[in-house]
Amino acid sequence: MIGVDTSVLVRYLVGTPLAQARKAAALVDGPEEIGLSPVALAECAHVLRTQYGVERGDILESLIALVQRENVRVLGLRTDVLLGVLVRARQLPGRPIPDALIVAASLAADALPLATFDRDQGRYGVVTREP
């Protein structure tokens, strides 16, 4: 397995600059298993939104498609749990991607309830409580 950072994900998803995008595509679309950090996914979502103006719904669709690839593993998370939370995020106002990743990590580690001051975290179907 080879780890992939945010810069590779962004180049793969936006297709520019062309030379780097082709290299990123060769890696992501290739046979080698790749590992994605949840932090890289969150950072990728942020870069796509702030630097490229991509809508959150489109970002979620791209991340869901990426995570569903046969050769992709999200480090420290179960794919089914992450996909479930990302799919749920599609239905939520604002589609908060970092919140979805926090919930997925807590679910994967069975670290529940989730301590938070953000009352909206419960919309992912997890038990929350204030600290």
Regions found by a protein language model. Give the residues of each.
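Active-site neighborhoods of divalent-metal-dependent phosphate/nucleic-acid chemistry enzymes
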Residues: 72-113
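Short, conserved active-site loops that position catalytic residues or coordinate cofactors/metal ions
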Residues: 38-46
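Acidic, PIN/NYN-like endoribonuclease modules and their adjacent C-terminal/linker elements
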Residues: 1, 103-131
